[in-house]
Amino acid sequence: MVARAREIKRRESAAFASRTPRSAEWLVQARTRMPDGVPMAWMVALQRHPPVVAVRGAGSRFWDLDGNEYLDFNVADQSMAAGFASAPIVAAIARQAGLGNHFLLPTAEAMEVCRLLTEQFGLPQWQFTLSASGANTDALRLARVATGRSAVLIFDGKYHGHVDQILWSSHYDSSDGAGGGGLAADALGLDPESGRHVDVLTYNDAAALRARLARGDVAAVLLEPALTNCGLVLPMPEFVAALNAEVRAAGALLIVDETHTQFAVYGGGTRHFGFEPDIVTGGKGIGGGIPIGVVGMTDALAGVMTGNLAYWPGREETGDCHGIATGGTLYANAMSLSAARAGLAEVFTPVAADRVGDLGERLQRGLQAQVDRVGLPWTIDRLGGRAQWRLTPAPPRTGADGFDSVVLPICDARKVFMANHGVWDAIAAAGPSVSYAASAADVDAYIAVAGKFLDELTA
């Protein structure tokens, strides 16, 4: 089947090139100005085929430089969960642009954004960054100060942004609780010392978690409520229970990174699976693509932030900010907060989330019916509006299981095949997501094109 997938990829890539000549020519010219012809490397790397040049989007669709229309199920890797040009967010952006984008001062929108975030995720106090990477950076710094410790625990298959300390992978041996096995960097350019205070455990392994916490040096346990960068791996109830009971008992903080799950279900995985975090982080789609990251925390941790504001390192006072190393000049800007208020209040509502969940169930059932029709031993799973092609019969429990269920040649062939049929599919390590702008007809269109691909794959 892999050989057949590669054959489909070759054929469909040629067809894709014939449909996108203007994008291709633009990329040739752009290589004189930008590495690989793109302003950010992921725009090539994540697609695993030449990208198109986008010119506009509306609702659940976007158009490229050649005039091709695509039904979007990638949602820009969760940053466009609201859909393109969402009317409430567009109106908020236009209004704020006329008032001023940033003041390096609070604006009135901040209080309402905090209230709306508390409604969804439960935590009472909030700070803002420009990305989820920034949010996780600030959360870890807060955890180190609050606990007086340095070690951070993360899990195989995770992704928490471009933060040096957590761009490492390994598999933890739970048999003796001693760790080991070494770490491998997830990317080039990291400080080799940045992984010195991190351990990578096996997701859903409560015994490994318990053993590592027993060493008494952990500042924070950072996890996604469901793994989303190696397919979709859901947490087992006993794992959730262990995290809730044992992290805090060991003197550490539990940080739940909702960036990829925050709008799949209302309240994200935190509410859906029953996590009880000390800190919640998020970002990406909150403001409809306007840069933002969020850090939610308990009142006690807010007190830690406030209590350290007066810290200074003993040098001549310069008027700079010292305290905990959080913040940034453009963090919590008026534009980001206005867009976030509109998104949280008018787009990502409980009623809308229920509708997206219903569409996600429609997508899951339709894809499973197509898989069963052609006789493949695959399963389709989902979390709310996010579905997952699982190219194995059994549900994955760990990151390693998740990666085993993502067969890249098949994913690559499916992505370019669907693009040629007017559907922009999710990137290989993710699954199709229903945006808040999508309709039942959009979901049915995805299912129909997916069925055509499966017919080709099994021919």
Regions found by a protein language model. Name each.
Residues 1-459:
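Conserved N-terminal phosphate-binding loop of PLP-dependent enzymes in the Aspartate aminotransferase
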